[in-house]
Amino acid sequence: MVRGNDMLPNGHFHKKWQFHVKTWFNQPARKQRRRNARAEKAKATFPRPVAGSLKPIVRCQTVKYNTKQRLGRGFTLEELKEAGIPAKFAPTVGIAVDHRRKNRSLETLQANVQRLKTYRASLVIFPRNMKKPKAFEASAADCSAASQAKGELLPLKGTKPALELVKITADMKEGSQYGKLRIERVNARLKGMREKRAADEAAKKDDK
């Protein structure tokens, strides 16, 4: 019942609203269908890994997100060269390749090279001709003992840097630390422009 000065309860429905009600009765069957599809995909891709190609570890773009790491599109040609894997051979053994990405950090380059070497060490390459296996292909015994990699390939593990606790000094409290970082970024960006301007001014003085 209505109490006080409240509005009278009235369902504001459209005509034929029953036809527009969304139900969720197919949820359990959908779950089973997805599970069956995953099993069929794993069976079809055997002996290749279920997760697909191996992806590199990259950093997100821009100052806002570059502290975060994620899996990228593919390994660079430089990373493949350092790991001793030919660029045309890599996609045939489940290694994603991205010829456009460039290495701007030695740390990332070394991490991805190590990632490639770890993957290559655990890789079992089935020979095309079992009677005449090539040097890099596995033997019949290794092929029979091989198992399909389930789940994520070499999952990305978050590592926390070791922090050293120090006492806050008076110099640290002076000014804005963020402001100092911004000034350093500006100085790095304008370094070439300022050097060119100084060189031009010096040349003008010499001409005079």
Swiss-Prot record:
Look up the record and give one Gene Ontology term from the biological process aspect.
translation
InterPro entries in the record: Ribosomal_eL13 (IPR001380), Ribosomal_eL13_CS (IPR018256)
Q: Which UniProt keywords apply?
A: Ribonucleoprotein, Ribosomal protein
Question: Quick check: keyword Hydrolase in the entry?
Answer: no
Which molecular function GO terms apply here?
RNA binding; structural constituent of ribosome
Record GO cellular component, one term? cytosolic large ribosomal subunit
> What's this protein's family per the entry?
Belongs to the eukaryotic ribosomal protein eL13 family.
HAMAP family xref list: Ribosomal_eL13
Q: What is this protein called?
A: Large ribosomal subunit protein eL13
Q: Which organism is it from?
A: Chlamydomonas sp. (strain W80)
Give the gene that encodes this protein.
Answer: RPL13
